A protein has these predicted regions:
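Membrane-interface segments of envelope glycosyltransferases acting on lipid-linked substrates or membrane lipids
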Residues: 1-123
Length: 123
């Protein structure tokens, strides 16, 4: 099984550390990769941890689709609201996990009903 973790950041703090910890916890059991905005500082950390990573200039359905075609994940694990929406637009039949790390600042101006994510199914 292959899992692609998707984040929208150029830093290595909360959600980024969680994604890296999940990847390391499943090392040798599940093939996982990390995708986020390009950032040499983050890449250096991930390289030091032995984590495969993909960088995108901007996270859009087109750029994420390119990574998906290259990596060919069985599951996509999106780590915030923005990445969840972008991933939902391009994941097709690939199961999507939407992991919201309580970063409510991403939700400003959005009004979502509880059922909004039901459309994408459950993993």
């Amino acid at each position: 099984m292959k899992v692609l973790h998707v984040l929208y950041s150029k830093i290595y703090t909360g959600a980024e550390k969680v994604a890296a910890q999940i990847i390391k916890a499943f090392e040798g059991k599940v093939d996982m990769a990390y995708c986020s905005l390009e950032c040499e500082e983050v890449w250096d950390i991930l390289d030091g941890m032995g984590i495969r990573h993909y960088g995108v200039e901007e996270l859009t359905p087109a750029t994420l689709s390119r990574v998906i075609r290259e990596y060919r994940p069985d599951v996509i694990h999106a780590h915030d609201m923005r990445t969840s929406f972008v991933a939902a637009l391009c994941c097709g039949k690939i199961p999507l996990i939407s992991h919201i790390h309580n970063n409510a600042y991403d939700a400003r101006g959005l009004l979502l009903s509880k059922g909004s994510f039901d459309h994408y199914g459950r993993v």
